[in-house]
Regions:
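Glycine-rich phosphate- or other oxyanion-binding loops that anchor nucleotides, phosphorylated ligands
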Residues: 1-128
Length: 128
């Protein structure tokens, strides 16, 4: 955690606790799930990523989203390891829409949200 809010640097690269991340990936593998590690550009804005999409792509990141920024800030404040388990809903870089998915895409998305994500949360919490 920064000593002063004045020390905050926007767009600072944050590295997760890889030992914790690898433990969570191991839990997923033991459960028969495949987790993909990805670089995430986190922004607290709900719309700025569209205006700045080309600039954000220069960060060579895999995902852009909003909520993880707050999650990692709180983990830093509480000095706790954390992992963002994300189910990707849309992709503004490729044009994959939030709506209009094929039946198979919707089935995979629903399975991730309704089965994999809750299972991983519970198993990760039990492992602590």
């Amino acid at each position: 955690m920064k000593d002063s809010i004045k020390d905050f640097v926007p767009f600072e690269r944050v590295e997760p606790d890889m030992e914790f991340i690898n433990n969570v990936v191991g839990i997923a593998e033991e459960s028969g799930y495949e987790l993909k590690k990805a670089s995430v550009f986190c922004t607290p804005s709900i719309a700025a990523e569209y205006y700045h999409l080309e600039e954000i792509k220069e960060f060579d990141t895999d995902l852009i989203e909003m909520e993880t920024a707050s999650l990692y800030l709180m983990a830093d404040l509480l000095e706790m390891p954390t992992v963002a388990l994300l189910v990707v809903s849309d992709n503004s870089a490729t044009g994959a829409a939030l709506v209009g998915r094929t039946e198979e895409e919707q089935r995979k998305y629903d399975y991730g949200r309704n089965v994999v994500l809750p299972t991983m949360i519970l198993k990760t919490a039990d492992a602590k």
